[in-house]
């Protein structure tokens, strides 16, 4: 008897989804090998709950939302940047292919998205419209920021520092704001403090810190040597260097080439360090941002857990990063 003799009987079987299928489908995601609970967005979320006092079960669900979304973004970022390494290992799409990795990243995002409904019992009202709006708005902001970053890269348009800050306010800031907004929406505290100036500063601080660390020997082990040059990316130090001397096209020419060889990238790095002092400038900006974050934290009455995180992400002096 053919399965087509009574096709309707086949639907339940066709719709079944086994644990083995799920495990295989998630392999590009698990390949990342990251503990989402120890990633910065999750750590920051737990620290900010000091002010919002959301019950642990609800906090756990929020972490189950932000962690996978952040990981999915890393999978997509690696594809869009044509990266080779993450955490010292081959990136997922080099192992499983671009198509499977995109599909898995999308699936992980939707799976996290569906967890919003689990927050309903903790909501201040039976309606969860605000919760859906939060995730919709911040995911949209993330994609807008990512788009303009890619647009600058692919069009070889160097933004101003102000434009770059607005971009990372969306792209990086969204992954920090999303869980904090969920905490705010679910908080049993009558009048929780306004933490968003601090959240936004932390997002900007983290991205510019990553931009500087991408030039360090330690980061080379994780992502390769000065990969921003190979990716043609306008990072914060590169933007400063290009704008510092618009008559010198060295960096633009190197970004256009997207070099893989170390000598070319070392030449660009030395120019940024010695000629335009862009690493010094970036370090100075990070120090100002750290100071601002600590001042905001003090205004909010302090938070030992968040203070520890700020100490953890504090940048090293320039000589330890660039002299080699």
From Swiss-Prot:
Assigned EC number: 4.2.3.106, 4.2.3.46
Entry superkingdom: Eukaryota
Annotated catalysed reactions: (2E)-geranyl diphosphate = (E)-beta-ocimene + diphosphate; (2E,6E)-farnesyl diphosphate = (3E,6E)-alpha-farnesene + diphosphate; (2E,6E,10E)-geranylgeranyl diphosphate = (E,E,E)-alpha-springene + diphosphate
Keyword Magnesium: yes
InterPro entries given in the database record: Isoprenoid_synthase_dom_sf, Polyprenyl_synt
A GO MF term: prenyltransferase activity
Binding annotation for Mg(2+) 1: 77, 81
Cofactor comment text: Binds 2 Mg(2+) ions per subunit.
Required cofactor(s): Mg(2+)
Signal peptide: none
Swiss-Prot/TrEMBL keywords: Lyase, Magnesium, Metal-binding, Transferase
Top EC group: lyase
Binding positions for Mg(2+) 2 per the UniProt entry: 77, 81
Gene3D superfamilies assigned: Farnesyl Diphosphate Synthase
Gene Ontology BP annotations: isoprenoid biosynthetic process
Pfam families: polyprenyl_synt
Functional summary from the UniProt entry: Terpene synthase that shows monoterpene synthase activity and produces (E)-beta-ocimene as a major product, using geranyl diphosphate (GPP) as substrate. Also shows sesquiterpene synthase activity as it is able to convert farnesyl diphosphate (FPP) into (E,E)-alpha-farnesene. Finally, TPS2 can convert geranylgeranyl diphosphate into (E,E,E)-alpha-springene.
Additional note from the record: IDS-like terpene synthases originate from a geranylgeranyl diphosphate synthase (GGDPS) progenitor in fungi, after the split of Melampsora from other genera within the class of pucciniomycetes. They lack coupling activity and act as classical terpene synthases.
Family of this protein: Belongs to the FPP/GGPP synthase family.
Protein name: IDS-like terpene synthase 2
Originating organism: Melampsora lini (Rust fungus)
Gene label: ILTPS2
